């Protein structure tokens, strides 16, 4: 099916461009003369009609060409070689700043000096605490759709179109399926990309993450043989459908910390709420010693009674009968073990990324104020900052452009409302996983407003970085984007947003989380590296627990290592169709 925007209906879709449409296009690898590091026109994989290059894209392309010609002459190299270098990326970011507004901290000297380009990136001493990391147990496949949204059209044939943009809307670069992380382009999406062997490489060898918080997902539906899919009856039954169980999460944390000889990972416990789940919460505390808790309002994770046959359901933070007994148990144990687990009182809950009405059961923030006031010793960390749009921000950008306001700033559903609701509640914190990833590259205007509003209403001390990796590859591209990002002066003046200073970035990227989890050492150099031979150190018992019958070095990791050893520059070739 395809979306007809004019009639606002779904229509039959035969899947590929027809002959008449193809006649209006040209192959992207032939039609794009410049091949800048970032595309300057929309590319189609053949399943949707690309739009013509916009005026803003033409201006970016012309400016990149001008900068590249000048720089390549000065450096005595070809324009093509220049565009393949870090200088080419700097030139493209400079051109985008000139056309779209100054979103990225980049200077002219970076076009000529690779060292300057590196120096402008995240410093080596940067302490990074990634509040949201995921991997999948070995018996389950990695989710293709989440990787595809970050990888773009090269995800085909596994994923043939943007899974979160069925209407073919355009981002700020004029693309309906823009690449978030260029390093993913061309890699196959296989069932093991989010398994532990590649997870460790992506997070601890390929990024600046100092400490990572391994998260998990409370299962909402289970498939029992002979039955239709349904909500689980209890937390034990829900384990069948979890991407990672509480025991597996804790075992991975223990393994990584043991082989590195320092605290490189913390882990969540599974927040199954309700009277009927209290015994399971205590069991996790006694057996796994989680560092904090992760839950989902939208998940059927609340056991409201002790009837063994009743199904679990969704829940709210402010439900005194359902959530409060769980909060009471967490707080009671926190008083007992807080010296050993200082972040145990952090209640992290997925909020947002859910189309539909503004209901706390779907992640709306309306249930937070009462709970935060009733439980001042608990910290309520809202993952994704309650953003409602599901991975693609085109409608949000239109609302901003239409000057649709709430409290004097553009109304970004439900993030603006969230920031204003909890602004005076010091135990409420905003985590930006996926919200940041889905906006920083493709919708930088939206990213600027989100960051500006969180800083304006909640302050730089209550915003936490999370990458939601490894769904979107290594966290490094998000770390670099945040370090280089800035809120344009025009937006700051119009809406009263604070500047995103280096001090603020250091807090967001790690220092605030360090305080929440009682981490005293915030010098990245004081943490020992995860050894490169981590795979050979995995015990048979650990492999069995993580449901890997045989864990071996995957071919893709070997290919990436070979590619890096050859020091091959990316050629910026795009594949697909462009409108002519």
Regions found by a protein language model. Name each.
Residues 1-77:
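N-terminal secretory signal peptides
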Residues 3, 7, 69-77, 96-133:
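C-terminal segment of N-terminal export signals and the immediately downstream linker at the start
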Residues 52, 139-193, 230-234, 307, ...:
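Active-site gating loops and adjacent loop-to-helix segments of metal-dependent hydrolytic enzymes
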Residues 70, 76-97, 143, 157-202, ...:
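Mid-to-C-terminal alpha-helical segments outside catalytic/metal-binding sites
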Residues 128-134, 150-191, 201-227, 264-270, ...:
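Divalent metal-dependent hydrolysis catalytic cores, especially in the metallo-beta-lactamase
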Residues 132-138, 350, 384:
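Histidine-centered divalent metal-coordination motifs
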Residues 137, 216-363:
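Active-site gating/metal-coordination segments in enzymes
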Residues 291, 300-302, 307-465, 473, ...:
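Catalytic pocket-lining loop regions of alpha/beta-barrel enzymes
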């Amino acid at each position: 099916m395809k979306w007809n925007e004019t009639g606002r209906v779904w229509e039959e879709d035969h899947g590929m461009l027809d002959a008449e449409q193809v006649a209006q296009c040209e192959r992207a690898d032939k039609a794009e003369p410049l091949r800048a590091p970032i595309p300057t026109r929309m590319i189609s994989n053949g399943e949707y009609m690309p739009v013509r290059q916009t005026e803003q894209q033409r201006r970016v392309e012309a400016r990149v060409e001008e900068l590249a010609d000048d720089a390549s002459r000065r450096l005595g190299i070809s324009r093509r070689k220049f565009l393949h270098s870090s200088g080419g990326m700097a030139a493209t970011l400079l051109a985008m700043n000139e056309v779209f507004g100054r979103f990225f901290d980049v200077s002219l000297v970076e076009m000529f000096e690779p060292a300057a380009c590196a120096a402008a990136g995240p410093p080596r001493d940067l302490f990074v605490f990634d509040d949201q990391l995921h991997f999948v147990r070995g018996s389950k496949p990695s989710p293709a759709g989440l990787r595809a949204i970050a990888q773009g059209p090269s995800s085909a044939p596994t994923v043939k179109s943007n899974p979160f943009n069925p209407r073919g809307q355009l981002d700020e670069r004029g693309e309906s399926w823009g690449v978030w992380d260029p390093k993913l382009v061309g890699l196959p999406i296989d069932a093991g990309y989010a398994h532990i062997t590649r997870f460790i490489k992506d997070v601890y060898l390929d990024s600046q993450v100092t400490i990572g918080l391994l998260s998990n997902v409370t299962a909402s539906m289970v498939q029992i043989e002979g039955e239709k899919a349904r909500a689980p009856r209890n937390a034990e039954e829900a384990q069948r459908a979890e991407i990672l169980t509480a025991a597996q999460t804790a075992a991975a944390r223990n393994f990584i910390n043991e082989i590195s000889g320092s605290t490189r990972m913390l882990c969540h416990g599974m927040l199954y709420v309700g009277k009927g789940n209290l015994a399971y919460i205590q069991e996790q505390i006694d057996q796994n010693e989680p560092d904090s808790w992760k839950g989902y309002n939208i998940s059927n994770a609340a056991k409201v009674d002790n009837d063994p046959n009743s199904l679990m359901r969704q829940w709210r933070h402010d439900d005194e009968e359902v959530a409060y007994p769980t909060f009471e148990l967490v707080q009671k144990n926190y008083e007992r073990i807080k010296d050993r687990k200082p972040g145990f009182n952090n209640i992290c809950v997925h909020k947002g990324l859910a189309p539909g009405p503004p209901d706390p059961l779907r992640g709306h923030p309306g249930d937070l104020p009462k709970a935060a006031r009733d439980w001042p010793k608990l910290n309520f960390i809202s993952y994704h900052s309650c953003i409602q749009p599901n991975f693609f921000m085109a409608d949000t950008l239109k609302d901003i452009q239409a000057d649709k306001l709430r409290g004097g700033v553009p109304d970004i559903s439900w993030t603006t409302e969230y920031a204003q609701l909890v602004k005076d509640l010091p135990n409420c914190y905003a985590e930006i996983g996926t919200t940041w990833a889905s906006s920083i590259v493709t919708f930088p205007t939206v990213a600027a407003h989100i960051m500006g509003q969180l800083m304006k209403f909640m302050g730089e001390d209550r915003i936490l970085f999370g990458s939601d990796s490894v769904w979107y590859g290594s966290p490094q591209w998000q770390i670099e984007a945040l370090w280089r990002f800035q809120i344009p002066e025009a937006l700051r003046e119009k809406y009263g947003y604070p500047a995103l200073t280096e001090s603020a970035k250091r807090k967001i990227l790690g220092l605030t989380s360090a305080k929440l989890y009682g981490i005293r050492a915030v010098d990245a150099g004081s943490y020992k590296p995860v050894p490169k031979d981590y795979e050979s150190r995995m015990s048979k018992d650990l492999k069995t627990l993580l449901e890997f019958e045989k864990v071996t070095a995957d071919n893709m990791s070997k290919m990436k290592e070979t590619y890096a050893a050859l020091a091959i520059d990316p050629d910026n070739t795009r594949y697909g169709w462009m409108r002519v």
